[in-house]
Amino acid sequence: MDWFTRIEGVDELESAQSFFDFFELEVDPVLLRSRHLHIMAQFNQRLTAAVPVHFVDEEESDRADWRLARRLLAESYQHTVAGPLNTQSGLAVYQRNNGSFIGWNDLLEVRP
């Protein structure tokens, strides 16, 4: 992910909105406010998995990195807002597979 941190200006971004402004992406501010953690977690996963292609021309390589990061951020936003959070979010709280139920009587038995 070193390629991402080398993009000029990225180290100054402090909020989800600042990322979208930096990469010149239009988003619904209400959705961004309510789902920013999920979007940015998805973006981080995509950044970690991405392997950019570097060109001999350093200026073109920098622009390609910016375009790749922009595309990954846009994909993260689209994926997260496309449906309900419990199916679209990659956060662990939504990935619990084993539900459990403890009956009221069982709870009363433990009581001193």
Curated annotation (Swiss-Prot):
GO biological process: nitrogen fixation
UniProt entry keywords in alphabetical sequence: Nitrogen fixation, Plasmid
Metal-binding as UniProt keyword: no
Family to which this protein belongs: Belongs to the NifW family.
Subunit structure: Homotrimer; associates with NifD.
UniProt function note: May protect the nitrogenase Fe-Mo protein from oxidative damage.
Protein name, as recorded: Nitrogenase-stabilizing/protective protein NifW
Native species: Enterobacter agglomerans
